């Protein structure tokens, strides 16, 4: 995959966070003074979410200037443009790309998973189920099988779904807590799902067809919520801690090995980018901007 690394000079915040746990012998101590200038003016709505890097290194987010848009920063550019406007009434949340460059978008008001085929700007409904609460975040296996979290915030409950290569949806589990962040590990044999209000991260065994089994508690926090998650190549899980203003890195053994302090308090999602794939971009709802820090390893897709 071609990757990009260029400064977002007008509205993107590069925040090299503070390393909190010295026990990770692979970490480099980072000081908050390493942060670049914070630009408070933002052209995104409070729905800023869905950070993702496409096949050619372009950087994408949702809700530029107004809800219902997908923003793109071209490789080598210093500014975002509106890449597509979603159909009337659709608003994106999570974004993921498959290995051929197709974009998938969780459209929460209309209970859809949307697709934009690589090389086009045509938005189509890839999957739909009216019984969903609201598809929130997405995860994808190397073979293209998708998963979506499906929270019901009012009832503090949620589900997880599988979407196969033909767009058929299968309910994997219901009656969970408020399912939110979701991710597949590098070996494609574990699915992670977090419950924001309940502050728990669950792990499932995953087979090549996207079936899950052997659910177990992977990690539980005692305060604040969670949002989006991503894995690096070593299987470490990067978790946006909504309200805490940090990204926490958890090893495959369930041990917190790093805590990165952000300038904002409400991170909504994370994604890997940069020349080597080791820059973590973080969207923040309260600031309506993006921050970044350097990871020890590239993201799982690099």
Name what the model sees in each region.
Residues 74-78, 117-121, 163-167, 205-210, ...:
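Short loop/turn segments that connect beta-strands within beta-propeller blades
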